[in-house]
Amino acid sequence: MEHANAQMLAAIALFSSLILWKIFAARRGRGGYIRRIPGLNEIDEAIGRATEMGRPMIFHPGVGEVQNVGTLAALGVLGYVARKAAQMGSRVIVTTAVPVVVPVAEDIVKQAYTQAGRPDLFHAEDIRFLAASGDQLALATANVMQQEGTAAHFFFGMYDYTSLLLTEPGQRTGAIQIAGTDQYFQVPFFIASCDYTVIGEELYAASAYLTREPTMLGSLVGQDYAKMVVLAVILLGALSVTLLGSQNPFVQLMGVYR
């Protein structure tokens, strides 16, 4: 195994230590700083607006399979949205293009309403598989928006060309729309058609950012520290090779050249 060496073992030990350190620090109330993400801050405002208007909201967890990291991040956001909606006595409609996501989303939403003491507000028929085809999915979602008169739309997860097809009808209805995806090619379409957009790795940080749960928060900050270490090593390596040549002690220690 090419990378099974002492340097890799040391890196794993260092990164694991950083993450564990920040997790334990977060549990003691010193989780670290996370910069403000406007799109996530406006989720509560969107839920409150829909509640005041007495109209439901739509949450769409993307078109990726349930094991996709973007879908998993979206389901974390769904849990937060469902909890807030339950506390405010509002209704969340989940639409999806992936059948396997239906029972997972149903369990998340049901648990949120139950924990909020409002199990009567949960309706299994609000978790809807619409269509696997992109065009049919967009048409069916637009139909739900029109029939239900939704006031807030959340689009989080992995998206393909359907991103604009899904959000453009919502823009026409005047609903507040918040989107987030890790697919950079779809970001311009969300920016054009949504009120707020969560971009790239901000999606992965969403659950920790919204809930401030110590384990997730500490893990997120610890990973950022690890990235800083990697960046520092890369810069030091590049400088040392440029100034001292490929045979200098630092490069030899890192095992870049053999």
Predicted regions and their residues:
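Short, acidic/small-residue loops that bind anionic groups at enzyme active sites
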Residues: 84-85, 173-191
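Soluble extracytoplasmic domains of inner/organellar membrane proteins
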Residues: 129-171, 176
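Hydrophobic alpha-helical transmembrane segments of small proteolipidic membrane proteins, enriched
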Residues: 1-38, 240-245
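Histidine-anchored nucleotide/phosphate-binding helix
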Residues: 71-89
